[in-house]
């Protein structure tokens, strides 16, 4: 989206319109700006500036109001060229640390416990719909594997990955195996595969298991299933969601059809995960996708603010979803701090 370089007055007025609209959810008029902000120029000058901004598509006039509201283009200019970053306040920092840091201190939680706590506190602090995607696993380090017989024809395989991430898969058996046979295969797999990334295992498992003396039937089953066993979990299984109650309470979603559309989108976990994973243009590590920049039609009235977090060489993602009339500065502050805190916590739970 191309912009000309707005002059100081235009930037001031656009910034004020967005900041006021975020707070009031009401269109902003020139008289409101003149009364509440000491800009040093007249109501007439403000009207002229607003007319110029409207002509260029940064603001628009709702049919029933004399005031103006920001457009997607106006929000994008604000986010890219006006918005400033500040630190999160101490109370919010403390709340984040108390919720997700304690799991690391106690050493009692799993990665899922940490991510569930993270998405809940993210929703509470942002007062928006919040999501966490667990890290992609291709670059994750495999630690160990175990197998549990569920019946004579079914077996659960449990993969332990770095930082307490766990993946489980139920496999159908075409042969009967004893516990002793399973133990032999498990020992061999752990000896030969531990310390490799899942991607390395998928590429080289046949070579790495050649010449072993364990049960060939079970070994061959593992080799044939390597593409599933050592692959990514489906994206919808990596998704944690919280804060639906906050987004449905926003004025933008008071109409029943808008609420139904929103709830339908939230319940589609695959689409929700892809929305966050594919959210738009990036500023540093923070990504902000506004309105029609989103890949799903149902999200054209939303903004998605997301940030990566890191666990060793794995990457996950945090996201805040809300109306375009969002407190962008606060969302960015929360996500920046949460991403750093989550990275530190998960990296410390080995």
Swiss-Prot record:
InterPro entries: GAF-like_dom_sf, HrcA, HrcA_C, WH-like_DNA-bd_sf, WH_DNA-bd_sf, WHTH_transcript_rep_HrcA_IDD. Keywords: Repressor, Stress response, Transcription, Transcription regulation. One of its GO terms (molecular function) is DNA binding. It holds the Pfam family HrcA. It comes from the Bacteria. Coiled coil: none annotated. One of its GO terms (biological process) is negative regulation of DNA-templated transcription. Belongs to the HrcA family. Negative regulator of class I heat shock genes (grpE-dnaK-dnaJ and groELS operons). Prevents heat-shock induction of these operons. This is Heat-inducible transcription repressor HrcA.
């Amino acid at each position: 989206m191309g912009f000309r370089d707005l002059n100081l007055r235009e930037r001031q007025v656009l910034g004020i319109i967005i900041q006021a609209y975020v707070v009031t959810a009401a269109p902003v008029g020139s008289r409101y700006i003149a009364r509440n902000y000491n800009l040093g120029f007249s109501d007439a000058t403000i009207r002229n500036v607003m007319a110029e901004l409207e002509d260029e598509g940064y603001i628009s006039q709702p049919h029933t109001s004399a005031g103006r509201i920001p457009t997607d283009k106006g929000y994008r200019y604000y986010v890219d060229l006006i918005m400033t970053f500040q630190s999160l306040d101490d109370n919010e920092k403390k709340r984040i640390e108390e919720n997700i840091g304690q799991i690391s201190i106690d050493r009692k939680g799993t990665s899922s416990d940490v991510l569930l706590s993270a998405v809940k506190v993210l929703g509470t602090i942002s007062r928006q719909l919040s999501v966490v995607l667990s890290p992609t696993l291709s670059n994750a380090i495999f630690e160990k594997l175990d197998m549990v017989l569920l019946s004579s024809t079914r077996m659960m395989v449990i993969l332990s990955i770095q930082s307490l991430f766990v993946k489980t898969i139920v496999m159908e058996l075409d042969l009967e195996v004893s516990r002793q046979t399973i133990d032999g295969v498990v020992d061999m797999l752990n000896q030969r595969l531990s310390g490799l990334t899942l991607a390395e295992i998928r590429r080289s498992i046949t070579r790495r298991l050649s010449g072993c003396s364990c049960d060939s039937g079970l070994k061959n089953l593992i080799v044939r299933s390597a593409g599933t066993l050592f692959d990514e979990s489906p994206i919808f299984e990596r998704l944690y969601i919280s804060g639906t109650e906050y987004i449905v309470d926003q004025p933008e979603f008071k109409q029943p059809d808008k609420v139904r559309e929103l709830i339908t989108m939230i319940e589609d976990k695959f689409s929700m995960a892809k929305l966050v994973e594919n959210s738009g243009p990036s500023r540093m590590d923070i990504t902000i996708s506004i309105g029609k920049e989103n890949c799903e039609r149902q999200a054209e009235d939303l903004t998605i603010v997301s940030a990566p977090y890191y666990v060793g060489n794995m990457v996950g993602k945090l996201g805040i979803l809300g109306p375009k009339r969002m407190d962008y500065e606060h969302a960015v502050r929360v996500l920046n701090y949460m991403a750093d805190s989550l990275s530190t916590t998960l990296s410390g739970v080995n």
